[in-house]
Structure formats: structure tokens, C-alpha cells
């Protein structure tokens, strides 16, 4: 059983790696990132390709996820009714801020983007790729969530993710755990997180935690406003922060609890377990 569990863990690690960025990976890069032999990685990739979870680019030979996992995730997300219930609030925030509005949900010890609304119709429009996983130390959303956790837990999560190397994100990205701890103290004190040319050059963002269980509990999600730094002056920051916190409170008030699992939910979960077990065998 331990061997099977280990193989399943490797399978999930492989899937999570391929989901980090919207690009294809070469076999050697996957092997290096996972710390596994190329032969073991190739066997997993071959199994996942045969079941339709992964595909190999015919020209480069690189590997990437198919849309199958995204479709399954969307089905799970829709079952929570979160997109339907939060859409009007996110739309209102986008209309009032005239900037890009995004929402991310806490999944274990990470944040994942789940929704966005574009509030800017003309001029310079900020529209980044919606990569699933949110980088925690350099984003307003990441800091907004981490600030709601006990400091020791927040620092542990941050250390496990690691401080990004210089040049990977924006020019003002946090470069040490100590600097992140100070930023979380500021975020906790004012109730919202900020990123100013940290995630991307020329981009600023403000995010607030969504806390359905009360103001002193860990957030279950975050919502944010983001746009060019030229539209995030001192007065703009105050205004955006107020709008974002109001939206976060409104979402918290209607946050849906997951309803009882239906037969189709259980069948879907069973199918996934069976197919991953085959991939790991």
C-alpha cells in the first residue's frame, strides 16, 4: 500500500507541476523538478497520455496537460455555486474600480484563481494569463490570505513555497522571509494586502481576505483589484482598498457551504481515483 501511495503522490506531483504554467515541459525538466529518474517520469507520462490527462507536442516532444482536468475542476467549482453567487459582487467591484477584479480560493496550503471580471473597457487594459496557482509572497492576494493565518503557520507555508529568485517576478518583489513577515504585519493591521510592482513590472494590486466565519478566522478566499501603477496613486489606493474590503465582506456574507455530494459527484471522484491508480501501477 505504501508503494501505491508513493506512486500516486508522484502522479499528483507531476500533474501539479504541469498545471503551474500554461506551457509544455520537456521530459528532462520534469525529471529535474520532481527529483525523479527520467524512466519513472516517462512511465507516468505515458500512462497519463494514454488516459487523456496529458498530451505530447508532436513537434517538440514536450508534455502539457489536456483540458480534461480543467473541465473536471470546473464541474467541481460549479457544484459549489461559488461562481454564480459571487459574480454580481465581482461585477460591481469591477464597474466601480474600472480595473481587473479577480477572486482566488484557498485549497489546502495554496491559492488558486477561480474567477475574474474586467472593469476597464478603454485605454490601457491589464489582462494577464489566469494561471491556476497564485504566487503567495509577491501578490496582494497571497499576502491577504497569509495575514489571516497564525504567523508561524504563514511563515511555514511561505518557506515551503520559497522566496522567488530575483528577476522572476516584478522589480519590487519581496526577497526574504523577514521582509514578508513585516509585510504581513502591515497587511494584518490595515485589513488588506498590496502588491506594487512585485508580481509584475508596472502593475499594482490590492486584495482583501474573505472570512465567512468571522473577522478573526482564516480566510477561505480573497478578492482583488489590479491595474497599471499609473492608476494606483495614493487616493486611488485608499478608494480601491475600501471597495475591495466591502466586496470581500459581501462575499463572506453569502459564502456557500458545499452541499451534500450527489451520486454524480461520488461517481466522478471514484473514476478519478481508479484512473490515477492505473497510472501509478
What is each PLM-predicted segment?
Residues 1-84, 249-257, 278-279:
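N-terminal helix-turn-helix
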Residues 17, 33, 85-96, 102, ...:
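Amphipathic alpha-helical regulatory segments at dimerization interfaces
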Residues 54-56, 103-104, 210:
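A structural signal for short hydrophobic beta-strand segments in well-ordered beta-sheet cores
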Residues 60, 64-163:
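Amphipathic alpha-helical effector-binding/dimerization core
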Residues 172-250, 267:
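Extended hydrophobic
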Residues 260-281:
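Signal-transducing coiled-coil/dimerization helices and immediately adjacent hinge/linker segments
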